[in-house]
Amino acid sequence: MKFKLKNRIIGAAILVGIITSMPFYLTAEDEEEKPIRRERLMQRFDKNKDGKLDESEREAIRKSFSRSRRSGEDNSAKRVDKIHVPDDYDPKKKYPFILTLHGYTGNGRAQLRFLPLDRLAEKYDFIYCAPDGIDRSWNATDACCDRQGKVDDSKYLRSLILKAMKEYNIDRKRVYITGLSNGGFMSYRMAHDHSDLVTAIVPFAGVGFDKWPSNPKNPVSVLHIHGTKDRTIKWGGGGLRSARYPSAEDN
């Protein structure tokens, strides 16, 4: 799949200003949260308290996650997806909208630690949303990362964008999606599925399908950011869940 580059959009201050104004360490996973997640899992599922998870305990974890997976509609009440506006919001003024998507096992709060739109929104005057994926994942591609494949996140995120447009004065020519790892995969999925809404995407360490079923109906700008030494979503491409994902360059 090829996305046409429109320099006037990629060069927009809303994107360049946000990316260049903040220091951050790019990684495909939130390393800071890994020990915390493991400790919580051990406390809950390590029944014999031997510090290890045997197969029965691992199966209990898998069942725990799968119980809450039904459909995007059934689980919508579990999502946190508040739309945030600047303190001095003026309904007569058009605002850019940024949708930022967390990585696998993350959530909206963790994504805002990675990309602090909550602090930047006042400075750059935009509206944003950092929603939660069901069970901390997005059903983006066959490789990453909803293991059940039953949540229609593409439909859900489209409805979220339309909700923002209905409730606030959103500039339809400045609708941006950014995401980390699994969220980056989802940003590519949204650019493909909803090119009528999405102006540009900025994926961090996330790609799309190895083979796209079609091109998007409208051109979407892409600013792809990826570490060449990323060991999770590899620069040169690889496989997850017996499915392939493309290299950053081929993507």
What are these regions (language model features)?
Residues D30-R44, R58-A60:
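EF-hand Ca2+-binding helix-loop-helix modules
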Residues D46-D50, D230:
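Acidic carboxylate motifs that coordinate Ca2+ or other divalent cations, activating on Asp/Glu
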Residues H224-H226, D230:
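Short beta-strand/loop motif that positions the catalytic acidic residue
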Residues M165-E167, R172-V220, R231:
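Primarily recognizes the serine-hydrolase "nucleophile elbow" in alpha/beta-hydrolase
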Residues G51-E55, Y95, I233:
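Glycine-aliphatic tripeptides that mark coil-to-beta-strand junctions in extracellular
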Residues E55-F65:
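Amphipathic regulatory helices of Ca2+-sensor modules
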Residues D74-Y176, M186-R189, D193, G236, ...:
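Serine-hydrolase catalytic machinery in alpha/beta-hydrolase-like enzymes
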Residues A12-S21:
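Bacterial N-terminal signal peptides
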